[in-house]
């Protein structure tokens, strides 16, 4: 607490308990009559005429605590105003970034959807036309090659099943090992509609195209088996794209496929693969729930299924 002194002068007489100019004691009684004594006559007048200027001292107390509190409140108000302004600017910039991200994701999904639909329609059309013309060409002799047709479709079904086991082995032994530098892009946030991991789809398409081409241009049981194998690889690739890329990673909408219960379990199992909870298991796709059952973690699978269902309902 600080003290300030204010001093002012006045011409008024001040009364103190003790007169600074006391009168002689003999004034208390009647003064003696002295002739020709001017001091006796004029002493009272002199005392009455003398005036002492009053000195007033005013002490002004300054409360440092109160001053500090008021200054603190003012600074707090200014700080709160600055914080509100900063938060408002941050919210605006965040909203702009979210809008840009949403627009970019929407564009990426549309781009991949167009590519997926065009490739699927093209491959499906080519497969159907190839099957039709191959068997119609072989029937020109008048005999229906039932045995060859049966072997072709049987191997097509077997090739589709076998591709699941091939994908499981390749995923574990190659993609998460020597080819991790390519597959790693699939385990990171994607930037753009495509990723380096998509090259594996092209690599798997090469033998399918070769087998289909050889089986289409040649007659006989062996060419028929090759044609069936290429057809099975093609069907598996299309199913893998819609379930893995569309349903699991939501690179494009898949429609009613998302409501199929078994496909929901497949998607949840593959999501557990990306969580690395069980050393990467499952490495397969369509038989992923079976792999989790083998390691005894079906409870975690059910939790993930329920989580995905709740998340889809919120959307």
UniProtKB/Swiss-Prot annotation:
Changing residue 249 to A: Loss of activity. Changing residue 274 to A: Loss of activity. The lineage of its organism: Eukaryota, Viridiplantae, Streptophyta, Embryophyta, Tracheophyta. It comes from Capsicum annuum (Capsicum pepper). This is Beta-carotene hydroxylase 1, chloroplastic. Its main location: plastid. Disulfide bonds: none annotated. The chain crosses the membrane at residues 112-132, 146-166, 196-216, 222-242. It is an enzyme of class 1 (oxidoreductase). Residues 1-58 form a transit peptide. One of its GO terms (cellular component) is chloroplast membrane. A motif (Histidine box-2) lies at residues 183-187. InterPro entries: BETA-OHASE-like, Fatty_acid_hydroxylase.
């Amino acid at each position: 607490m600080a003290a300030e002194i204010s001093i002012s002068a006045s011409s008024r007489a001040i009364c103190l308990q003790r007169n600074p100019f006391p009168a002689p004691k003999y004034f208390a009684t009647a003064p003696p009559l002295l002739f020709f004594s001017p001091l006796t006559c004029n002493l009272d007048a002199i005392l009455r005429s003398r005036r002492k200027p009053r000195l007033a001292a005013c002490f002004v107390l300054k409360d440092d605590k109160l001053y500090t509190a008021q200054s603190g409140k003012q600074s707090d108000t200014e700080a709160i105003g600055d914080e509100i302004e900063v938060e408002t600017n941050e919210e605006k910039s965040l909203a702009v970034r979210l809008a840009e991200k949403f627009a970019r994701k929407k564009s990426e999904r549309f781009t991949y959807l167009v590519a997926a639909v065009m490739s699927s329609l093209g491959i499906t059309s080519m497969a159907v036309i190839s099957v039709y013309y191959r068997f119609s060409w072989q029937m020109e002799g008048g005999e229906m090659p039932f045995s060859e047709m049966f072997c072709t479709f049987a191997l097509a079904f077997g090739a589709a099943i076998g591709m699941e086991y091939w994908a499981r082995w390749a995923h574990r032994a190659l993609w998460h090992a020597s080819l991790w530098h390519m597959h790693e892009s699939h385990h990171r946030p994607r930037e753009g509609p495509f990723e380096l991991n998509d090259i594996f789809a092209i690599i798997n398409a090469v033998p399918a195209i070769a087998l289909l081409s050889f089986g289409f241009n040649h007659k006989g049981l062996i060419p028929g088996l090759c044609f069936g194998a290429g057809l099975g690889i093609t069907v598996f690739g299309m199913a893998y794209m819609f379930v893995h890329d569309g349903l699991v990673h939501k690179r494009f909408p898949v429609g009613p496929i998302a409501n199929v219960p078994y496909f929901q379990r497949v998607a949840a199992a593959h999501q557990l693969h990306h969580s690395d909870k069980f050393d990467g298991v499952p490495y397969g796709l369509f038989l992923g729930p079976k792999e989790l059952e083998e390691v005894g973690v079906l409870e975690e699978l059910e939790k993930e299924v329920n989580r995905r269902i709740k998340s889809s309902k919120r959307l």
